[in-house]
Curated annotation (Swiss-Prot):
GN (gene name): Prss40
SUPFAM superfamilies in UniProt: Trypsin-like serine proteases
Source species of the chain: Mus musculus (Mouse)
Annotated signal peptide: 1-34
Compartments where found: Cytoplasmic vesicle, Secretory vesicle, Acrosome; Secreted
Protein name per UniProt: Serine protease 40
Length: 365
């Protein structure tokens, strides 16, 4: 997202916002009877995967995490198993979210440099990008479907992209899809939801992107409330950012948490009736420096439910056939490079920067 931060830190925190790593590694109790043991030839270890007989509705959004943890902090290993890292030329540029065995959502603005599938990879099963585990997978992209109306009718409108993976993933406790909400879904007023990503922890000090996945609890607000932070565009004013029906806003009421550069395309998920739904994809925000003065803005996934279903159906004849890369394969060796190469991570490019009512708005990757 444009970088999840708490106080002076993205989803993480440099002060009281920084907490210890959460939750031990354990398998999904909901489907323990449907797990099978598989030997990973790369490191001769045995892991558990979900049997392929489970339907998407049975497995999506099911994790052991059901409660609340306060503040921005490092995310535990199995908390957000749909979280993905989008890689351009081997480097993290954006977040993404798994929604099916071979389908991933992200933000359209992450694909301004290239829309060639072979330029991208999707990393799943990671919390620390420098530390692959036996669950980690690096997937090739077969198809990039950018919404045809992206940025067409209003700034950052239809900021969504659908990626078809070249091969299907095997579900495990570390790799599971989030549920996609239907168009008519009702989210309770002031619902507490969670954003996650590997974006910058601070905008004012450009330290390297964090390797560890960070998370933050944000409160959904109505679009009418959100519009109060972003005045409507006036001809000649140079203002173009506004809140439309295809967007959803979320904020920490203390204004201490925000998305930041590198988080774009990552998920905003809400727990609804026992399952986690991806209600938003990180899109844009005001600058993530203190003080945080406005909500974070996400692409509203339910608005695009039909578009997602139609494109998945029309692409069903494209059969993925390439095996995923395992951490032990050459492509996965040292996926981020050692610490000496941290500076090689692509720095976010300011795609849009406007002064709006003394708020510097930016959409960053």
């Amino acid at each position: 997202m444009c970088g999840i931060r708490a106080k002076k830190s993205g989803l993480g925190g440099y002060g009281a916002g920084l907490l210890a790593a959460l939750l031990g590694v354990s398998f999904l109790s909901q489907h323990a009877q449907t797990a099978e043991h598989v030997t990973n030839a790369a490191n001769n270890t045995t892991i558990q995967i979900m049997k392929s007989t489970l339907s998407l509705s049975e497995v999506c959004g099911k994790t052991k995490f059901q409660g609340k943890i306060y503040g921005g902090q490092i995310a535990g290993a199995e908390r957000w198993p749909w979280q993905a890292s989008l890689r351009l030329y081997g480097r993290h540029i954006c977040g993404a979210v798994l929604i099916d065995k071979n389908w991933v959502l992200s933000a359209a603005h992450c694909f301004q440099r290239s829309q060639e599938p072979s330029d991208y990879h999707v990393m799943l099963g990671y919390t620390d990008l420098n530390s692959p585990t036996r669950y980690s997978r690096t997937m090739s992209v077969q198809k990039v479907i950018v919404h045809k109306d992206y940025n067409r009718f209003h700034t950052q409108g239809s900021d969504i992209v659908l990626l078809q993976l070249r091969s299907s993933v095997e579900y495990s406790s570390h790799i599971l899809p989030a549920c996609v909400p239907e168009e008519n879904i009702k989210i309770p007023k002031e619902k507490a939801c969670w954003a996650s990503g590997w974006g910058y922890l601070r905008e004012d000090v450009r330290i390297p992107l964090p390797n560890e996945l960070y998370e933050a609890e944000l409160i959904i607000m109505s679009n009418d409330q959100c519009k109060g932070f972003f005045p409507p565009p006036v001809p000649g004013s140079g203002r173009s950012y506004y809140i439309y029906d295809d967007m959803v806003c979320a904020a920490d009421y203390d204004m201490s948490k925000s998305i930041c550069a590198g988080d774009s395309g990552g998920p905003l998920v809400c727990l609804l009736e026992g399952s986690w739904y991806v209600v938003g994809l990180t899109s844009w925000s005001s600058t993530c420096e203190e003080p945080i003065v406005s909500p974070s803005v996400f692409a509203r996934v339910s608005y695009f439910d039909k578009w997602i279903k139609d494109n998945k159906k029309s692409s069903s004849n494209s059969k993925p056939g390439e095996s995923p890369h395992h951490p032990g394969s050459p492509e996965n060796e040292n996926p981020e490079g050692d610490n000496k190469n941290q500076g090689a991570v692509i720095k976010p490019t300011v795609c849009t920067a406007l002064l709006l009512s003394q708020i510097l708005l930016q959409q960053l990757i």
